[in-house]
Amino acid sequence: MNIVRKINDELSIAGQITLNQLQQIADEGYKSVLNLRLANETGLLANEQEKTELLGLYYVNLQTQAENINHQGMSEIYQLITKLPKPTLIHCDNSIRSAAIVFLYIAIKQGIGFEKALQKVISLGLI
């Protein structure tokens, strides 16, 4: 089972979540799930969107590859995360993409330029 890591009061990250974890995050008051996984990845939770929405959570699958994170793409992701009901769980297969996206989101929100934040994410080995 993957660990859900709370980053701040608005955002948490995880690898692929299980049905039990999905129920747990709903019980803990999460409002939305952002899935970064690609449709062709292995180990996906079957019917994740349907199961998430049945629990009353907002769900978005924004298929994101780490090597394709760029300024334009991150701008779109930033706007999406900003609009999602909070708290939000952001997950991928092993939480590395999730960590990179959340790091970039927080850095941009704090006024750090995208390029500087991206270099830090790269130096941390997240992408």
Regions found by a protein language model. Give the residues of each.
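Cys-dependent protein tyrosine phosphatase-like superfamily
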Residues: 1-89, 103-127
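A phosphate-binding catalytic loop at a beta-strand-loop-alpha-helix junction
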Residues: 88-99
